């Protein structure tokens, strides 16, 4: 698996100050995608164990971070490898809230409870789901590009067996 970007601090990919990792590879090929170069699974750098530990040290060493966001590309095309990274993150840095982006919908990702995608979903807290649809582009939306995309509270959704929208801690 390759990563095509890492930002130790970002306010664009989820609520609060977050680290962001961009996973290479996507097969959705959404017209108007903001980063089509990330579709290539070989783009960027290998996500070696040494690089993973370096990023985990960054995250653990920054008390201002509210969590980690994983996007791409689409991380669910490398679900097993991304799950392994999240496991290592939690082992070495403790509980870190994880947001994840996907062109798949929550319903698609949660359909098969024995899949690698379902396992990855269960390791995360918030899912930004759905393909980017250029005709539904809305720059006023928080954390997503088109109005069909949703912010899903994964833990609540898995518990209730249906997609439950995420609620901001800053606007409750």
Regions found by a protein language model. Give the residues of each.
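A generic structural signal for alpha->beta connector loops
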Residues: 95, 123-124, 148
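Structural recognition of alpha->loop->beta junctions
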Residues: 53-56, 113-136
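N-terminal pre-triad scaffold of radical SAM enzymes
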Residues: 2-29
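Conserved Radical SAM active-site core
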Residues: 1-4, 17, 35-117
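Residues at the C-termini of beta-strands that transition into short coil/loop
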Residues: 7, 131, 155
């Amino acid at each position: 698996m390759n990563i095509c970007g890492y930002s130790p601090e970002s306010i664009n990919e989820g609520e609060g100050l977050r680290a962001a990792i961009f996973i290479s590879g996507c097969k959705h090929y959404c017209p108007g995608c903001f980063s089509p170069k990330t579709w290539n699974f070989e783009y960027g750098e290998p996500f070696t164990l040494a690089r993973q530990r370096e990023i985990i040290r960054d995250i653990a060493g920054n008390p201002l971070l509210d969590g980690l966001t994983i996007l791409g590309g689409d991380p669910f095309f490398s679900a097993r490898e991304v799950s392994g990274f999240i496991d290592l993150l939690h082992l070495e840095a403790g509980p870190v809230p994880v947001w994840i982006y996907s062109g798949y919908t929550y319903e698609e990702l949660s359909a098969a409870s024995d899949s690698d995608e379902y396992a990855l979903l269960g390791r995360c807290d918030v899912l930004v789901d759905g393909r980017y649809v250029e005709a539904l582009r809305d720059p006023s939306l928080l954390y997503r590009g088109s109005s069909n995309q949703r912010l899903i509270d994964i833990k609540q959704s898995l518990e209730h067996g249906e997609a439950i929208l995420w609620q901001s801690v800053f606007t409750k």
